[in-house]
Amino acid sequence: MPAKGPLTPQQLSLINRYWRAANYLSVGQIYLMKNPLLREPLQPEHIKPRLLGHWGTTPGLNFIYAHLNRIIQQRNANVIYICGPGHGGPGMVANTYLEGTYSEIYPAISEDEAGMERLFRQFSFPGGIPSHAAPETPGSIHEGGELGYALVHAYGAAFDNPDLVVACVVGDGEAETGALATSWHSNKFLNPARDGAVLPILHLNGYKIANPTVLARLSDDDLDNLFRGYGYEPFFVEGSEPADMHQKMAATLDTIFQRIQDIKKNADVHSPERPRWPMIILRSPKGWTGPKTVDGLVVENYWRAHQVPVANCRENDAHRKILEDWMKSYDPSDLFDEKGALKPELRALAPKGEARIGANPHANGGLLRKELHMPDFRQYAVNVTEPGAIEAQSTKILGDFLRDVMKLNETEKNFRIFGPDETASNRLGSVLEATNRVWMAETLDMDDHLAADGRVMEVLSEHLCQGWLEGYLLSGRHGFFSCYEAFIHIIDSMFNQHAKWLQVARELEWRKPISSLNYLLTSHVWRQDHNGFSHQDPGFVDLVANKSADIVRVYFPPDANTLLWVGDHCLKTWNRVNVIVAGKQPEPQWLTMAEAEKHCEAGLGIWEWAGTEDGLEPDIVMACAGDVPTMETLAAVDLLRQSLPHLRIRVVNVVDLMVLQSPHQHPHGISDEEFDRMFTTNRPVIFAYHGYPYLIHRLVYKRTNHSNFHVRGFIEQGTTTTPFDMTVLNELDRFHLAMEAVERLPLGESVAKPLIDNFTEKLALHKDYIRQHGEDMPEIRDWKWTWPR
């Protein structure tokens, strides 16, 4: 009896053949290197020596792709496809090949038998392409190697893209991750009047690598209740018989796309109701249409289908026969013509031009990227008449600047600010003068700065902030992410994956540059004295420094004017990850705006006004990177100038950390000659650094004077205490820095010992004072730089 549904018998036959073609190409990529159309009996030499790839999820991905093509054609829909199970890469490559996008981008992979052979051979092969939906895959903005981020990327791409539908396949294994579990709440931030739609497709094929999945073992009632609780309207598509499943999927997508159209049509621009967005729960067999058993063991609809369901096909004749029968079951002669091209009636099922999923410009966001309209950062300058004479909250000044970036780009609607409930805490609250926090859930009369059309995105999940921003950037927009320094570690591995994506994408001429991912790390280690050890960790920078030098930049602006320059610069860059570390508390302001510009452009500099070298070779170099280390260094210099008035001191401040490397290691690196001019070739260098000391040693280890670098920083000593005591516990304070300088100088015991005794006594007084009074000593709290220029 014919399956019932919206597809005519002819349409059903065509879409099933298209699906078979995608499945055939997927299997071919995993197994074959020759004889792509099986026009001769399958021989061992036709098969790859190493069989790599994942079959289990792939037929389901191909099934979804074929039906999205149909709905794009039928409704002239604007759709991109996020493949959460990115290990189903063979399917994504196969479908972009069938629609013609792949051959347009990679002409050597032509639409004929020779091109198909190259398509098969290159997959997971040296000199070829990776196994996942990597940057090399047209239409992909999500590799799906590390699981958990598909849905949050989908929402990021949908924000401010009102005509876009982001179809997002969530594997049932990925659905067990923490990041994905919280991503379902992204619908509370999606405004149907100004944003696109996200269509989650939860693919329940039942198994992970070697275990069942949790959601697949829930009843339909439990799943329905779960996702209705999240605010979705689930539609179930379940089965294993292809004709029946095609009809169900076609009918479901017809209903859902009409539902999306109605939701958007009825949305009020200013006060839209939060709709119950549709989603699909697709139950289909893992390894669908593949071998049912191998060697008497169940494969289809079981975890054994996950990767390569038939192994050792070169060596094992029986296995090779299973593979050949499997591939022939798709009947390639019914799918491809004599030349090896997809038959015209099947090619007609794919959309044309940019309507193709693989050619959609939203999945190559650099094509759509527009430069931000930027205010002149100099207008926000702090008026510094003398170094250290006044204090300011650097991030508050930056917040004023970001507020006006928001205002200037309101028409374009291509800039958002992200943070895990920390925008106000991080002193960026000025941005709320220009916009609100986006919020589509219930509001109360007492709520402030919550609105459906807000452009500040706050949720207490660093995973969501990072993922939304990545999706937003990858689809062509701009953003800024502020976070407590210690808790940015929560997204360490998300940063890793994005940096890897950027590194590969930079090498692909067809992938146009996207806006940089900009982090502001504040509420940092040296001012988390009130929250304690759990909040004290500057190590994210160490992770960042491991990545490709072409990708990462790390900045430690010491005051507000340098922070303004750095913030402006980072928002104008592309294909980078920029990390800015700056404090939010009141702190001394050192440089005029003119000085700040010159200093930041160089990345580091000698602060002649702070030193005493008078044009001669210094006796010692006092170097610093970071706002608190800068203040403590200058306080140490103050002590040394008072104690040793004839000592020649040079003060070097580093704002762009990567300048410490050589130009061969990093494009911002300074030459050996410049480094030696700055740090000398034989004088002691006392380096006060914001983070873990070893990073500085690592960056400078090839320099002439490396053996004379004595770096102090965070040495994993923390608690709830006073701000100054944090530096004392880690021996980064002015007294330890001054003692280190005295010990490294050839002063003689008669000069050095009284100084060291004095500084040691000061530390003892400090310890007693804070335990008695609960705050730092007045001479610490009230210290100011008083030396004239």
Curated annotation (Swiss-Prot):
GO biological process, one term: carbohydrate metabolic process
InterPro entries registered for this protein in UniProt: Phosphoketolase, THDP-binding, Transketo_C/PFOR_II, Xul5P/Fru6P_PKetolase, Xul5P/Fru6P_PKetolase_C, Xul5P/Fru6P_PKetolase_CS, Xul5P/Fru6P_PKetolase_N, Xul5P/Fru6P_PKetolase_ThDP_BS
Domain of life where this protein originates: Bacteria
Required co-factors: thiamine diphosphate
PROSITE patterns from the UniProt entry: PHOSPHOKETOLASE_1 (PS60002), PHOSPHOKETOLASE_2 (PS60003)
Keywords: Lyase, Thiamine pyrophosphate
KW Transport (keyword) present: no
EC number of the protein: 4.1.2.-
UniProt GO molecular function: aldehyde-lyase activity
Broad enzyme group: lyase
Pfam families: XFP, XFP_C, XFP_N
Similarity comment: Belongs to the XFP family.
Annotated protein name in UniProt: Probable phosphoketolase
Species, as recorded: Brucella suis biovar 1 (strain 1330)
